[in-house]
Each structure stands twice: as C-alpha cells, then as structure tokens.
C-alpha cells in the first residue's frame, strides 16, 4: 500500500470518529490583521519580496500596530510529489516554505498561505480537493498559521462540506491555523460558516476603486462602496471568532487619500479583518498614516466584537454607529458624494437603541465627550483640517458643525461623561 493510500485511510478514520469536527478555538477573537500578496502583486511573488515585506512591516511599525499575519496568496505552488504531497515553486522560493515561515516567525509575525477547495486554484495551480489532509499536514510542517481557502474550479462541490473537510484536516494536523473562508458569499456562508472558519468572504473580489467596479470581461471586481452596501444586513452573524469579511484592503493602491481614509474607516466600523494589500517597500507617508492609525484600529479591534450599523441613509451621506466597550460608541459620517458636505449634527436626532447589542445612545440624557479619530488629517485635505480643528474634542451638549470633503469621512469616538441632572 502506498504512503498516499495509508494517509487517506487514516484521514477517513479520523473523520469517522468525529474527533476533528471543529475549528481551532481561541483564534480571531478580534478581526485578524495582516498583509497579503494578491491585491498588488498577484502572481509576481517570490522569496525576496516576502522577506523584504516582513522587514518593512517591522521597520515601519506595522507589526506594532497589530498586523501580525504575512500571507502568501495564489501562485506559490509547485507540483505534487509522487505521494501526492504539495510542494512549493523552487524557482520562486528556493529556500523552501518551511525556511520562509521560520524567517517570518523570527520577525514576531505569523505565516499565512493560500489554497483552493477545487482541483485547481484560481490561477490554475494544484488545489486541495482530494488532498485536504495531506495539504494540512504539509502546512503544519511548514509552520503555517493562517489559511486562505478559495472557491475556484469547485463545480459540483458542496461549499459547507468542502470547507468543513479542510477545517477537519487542519484540526487533525494539530497546528492552530486561522481558517479564512474565501467562498465569495455565493452560498451565504454567514448562515453556516461560524462553526467552520474564523471569517468568511461576503462578496466577490474588491478592486482599487471607490465607487465604480472594474470590469474584466467575464467578471467584475467590486468597488469599495459596492461591497459596503452589502454588509449592513449581515452584522448579526459577526462576533469574536467568526467575522464577516468584505475582502482585503485596497489602501495605497491608487485611490485618493480621502478615499483610502474612508475605505479604511468603514472596514473598521464593520469589525472587518484588516488585511493590507499594497506595496510596503514603496509606501507613502499618507498611506502609512492611514493603516497605522491606532485610534481607528482600536475601533475595529474592540473586544465587544459588534459590527457597526448604518443608522441613517441620506443618499450621498450615511451615518454609521458601532457599539464599543466601556459604553463608548464610534460614529462615522460618510460622504459618498462628489461635493463637500456641510454637516451639522444635532445629537438628539441620533437617539436610538441598537437591537443587536441592546445599547442605547441616550443623547437626550447622556453627555459624551468626543474626539476626531483622523485629527490631524493629511495636509493636502484642506477642508478636513478645519473639520479636525472644530471637532478636536468637545461635548455632545452642543451641536457639531463640520465640512466633510468628497469621498471622505468624519469619524468620532464618543465616551460617556456625567449624566445630566
């Protein structure tokens, strides 16, 4: 009997006992943060790029800001060996994945990798279908901490079954792995994936476009606003250990500074995984300031783990709230329009109870202090500088008037103060 057949028999035995029918607990108690190769580099990846990126993540303070996963997406694969075990592309990764994982770990980071539930990946490299337990064992030997698992070339597969099988394989291999389900929302994974993975994609792929998607002929990549519009009804499914994933960040990949700031802010309001996808070896100060904004990241990483809600939609202007720990709230006003918006907030107009969390804003009886989470803002956003000065830190006992530039946000953190007498 070949080694492959022995391994498959062992895997079937494990499954029949039900010993591995769970994901790893304790992971992703807040949304995962890291960097991924795909959005910027796609298949143009190699060992040198990964090591340089790891070095930059440490040097620039990106790891200290919370981005601990360095994830290699599609196109790392070689072929399967004679026993069916996956290998890396030795031309791209001459030292091997195990050595590369050790390098990433030496930087205080975690190592992520990619595969696909189908026979082939999206770029037509070997997928994991029929080799789930073998691949999981290889990943464990390489020291992998994160698996993004795609859904290309998956015709005739049952999504829940296919993802559950890889979940069980990862658990059987014995190394804790954050399992990122990339099924594009096609079979409503929010209804079944909380016991299978730690996050699940809710839509198709994102593009570096704020309000109009990018057409690639037989498919269209979605804009930031396209994806945002699909998230509000899904908030009840998210929470510690199981997150809605609106796809990786496009900050630094060609949108304006205002649009990058709005994109990052809204993903934080959604309690979304924050997975960077830009070139960290050639990053602007404006982009670095956005992705390392500790105050905004704290909104995303709040341990209460509640996804924000769109409270009011006035067309081009949206008002979002997110309950935070210790009675705090995050509030974001998003200007989707093409012109600056003169915004006046009369706080009592936003007195409501969030049914999901049971929390009430109580602006009629509770005074909050608030601070602008983007103060100071980049120097090229002249209108926003006035906003930052106006809303630096004050109380909700008086209205707030600010100017929000086109495709930009006002983001506030509200902290309760003494109750009115």
Place the predicted regions along the sequence by residue.
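Bacterial Sec-dependent N-terminal signal peptides
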Residues: 1-22
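N-terminal module-boundary/linker segments of secreted carbohydrate-active enzymes
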Residues: 22-51, 56
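Structural recognition of the beta-strand scaffold that forms the well-ordered cores
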Residues: 27, 31-37, 66-72, 110-115, ...
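Aromatic-lined carbohydrate-binding/catalytic grooves of carbohydrate-active enzymes
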Residues: 53, 57-156
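Glycan-recognition surfaces
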Residues: 131, 178-279
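Catalytic cores of secreted or luminal carbohydrate-active enzymes
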Residues: 261-311
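Carbohydrate-binding surface patches
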Residues: 267-270, 275-277, 313-354, 407
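C-terminal beta-strand-rich structural cap/linker in extracellular carbohydrate-active enzymes
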Residues: 389-421
